[in-house]
Amino acid sequence: MAEDITVEQIRFKESGNGIIVEPSKGLMWMKNDTYQLTKKWMSWIQTRDYIQELNRKKFAGYGNWRMPTTSEARSLYDKNHSNKDHWGQHVPVDTIFTPGFGFLCWTSEVRNKVQAVRFGYRRGVTTFDDAYRTSRGSSRLVRDILKEDDIS
């Protein structure tokens, strides 16, 4: 009698050029977050401006990078994985992403034009913070995979 074998579906795959593909959700993530790319913390406003610069330069060949939604940022939080943040603290994020990232992630969601949502990878919680505050601010940028993209 044959045993049932469960094969774990691979959620992410590395695509090269610092890109991680998540085919099941139609997303492409940057392997490094904005802190790792720039070696500095950013406010939500600075992150928005940095994304515009990356899009002008077509980072990894694409011009439609953005901050993740809160739901997308939260989706990277997975207690089945163990990675390390900038301070060397345990963070439940897949190790396909480069260790040493910021544990607070700016998202695309804002309220009252001065506050933005940050997702905290250490505890898996969201908070509102001043969009002009740089304190440990970073973001893992993402883009939607388009039909014309070659992601092989």
What are the residue ranges of the model-derived segments?
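Glycine-aromatic-enriched surface loops/turns that form tight recognition elements
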Residues: 1-66, 71-152
